């Protein structure tokens, strides 16, 4: 009687018990007899160790790919929620610290032509016959998180992400090149004068 009983508790199952269970088919009730931890189920296969339980193993030593490491959180991240635009400093910090992870990539953000730099420095607009110089263009604060996500994806070295960023930057440069001509061609004063000169229903004589 004693020899026919199955061992319970923390006793490891023998090879004969495992082979017998494999032959009869795995069931939850039989696995419960072999599992030292109640309430946790995992199959037992010959020649392999049992997988670690996710409830008790919170950290695993996985092989990390150096090419896919994300940048660490810097001190500039702490200023996101207090209204300070840290986009320029964050981009410089990421490019200086993680530029070696993209040996085959193209940093279109660093490629600024003389025409782009000149258009971003000062943009002259013609309003009422006078020129007003606007300060340097900066990304909107609402785009700060989007810029950070784009930089993190770019540092991963993914070819489609690099291609999308390259196309986006080229389109942005093209828009900045044409911005000055578009602003100069827009004359709001002439449109206002034309609207005031048009006859209205109040000025028409009554019949």
UniProtKB/Swiss-Prot annotation:
The keyword Metal-binding does not apply. One of its GO terms (cellular component) is virion component. InterPro entries: Corona_nucI, N2-like_embe-CoV. The keyword Translocase does not apply. Pfam families: Corona_I. It is found in: Virion. It comes from the Viruses. Keywords: Virion. Belongs to the coronavirus I protein family. Structural protein that is not essential for the viral replication either in tissue culture or in its natural host. The gene encoding this protein is included within the N gene (alternative ORF). This is Protein I.
């Amino acid at each position: 009687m004693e020899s026919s009983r199955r061992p319970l508790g923390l006793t490891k199952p023998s090879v004969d018990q495992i082979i017998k269970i494999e032959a009869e088919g795995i069931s939850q009730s039989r696995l419960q007899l072999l599992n030292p931890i109640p309430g946790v189920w995992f199959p037992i296969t010959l020649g392999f160790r049992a997988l670690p339980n996710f409830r008790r193993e919170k950290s695993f030593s996985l092989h990390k790919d150096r090419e896919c490491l994300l940048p660490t959180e810097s001190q500039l991240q702490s200023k996101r929620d207090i209204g300070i635009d840290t986009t320029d400093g964050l981009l410089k910090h990421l490019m200086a610290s993680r530029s070696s992870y993209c040996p085959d990539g193209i940093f279109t953000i660093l490629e600024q032509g003389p025409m782009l730099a000149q258009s971003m420095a000062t943009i002259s607009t013609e309003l009422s016959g006078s020129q007003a110089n606007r300060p340097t263009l900066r990304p909107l604060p609402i785009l700060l998180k989007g810029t950070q996500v784009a930089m993190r994806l770019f540092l991963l070295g993914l070819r489609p992400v690099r291609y999308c960023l390259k196309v986006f930057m080229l389109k942005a440069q093209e828009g900045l090149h044409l911005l000055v001509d578009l602003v100069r061609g827009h004359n709001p004063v002439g449109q206002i004068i034309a609207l005031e000169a048009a006859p209205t229903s109040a000025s028409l004589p009554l019949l």
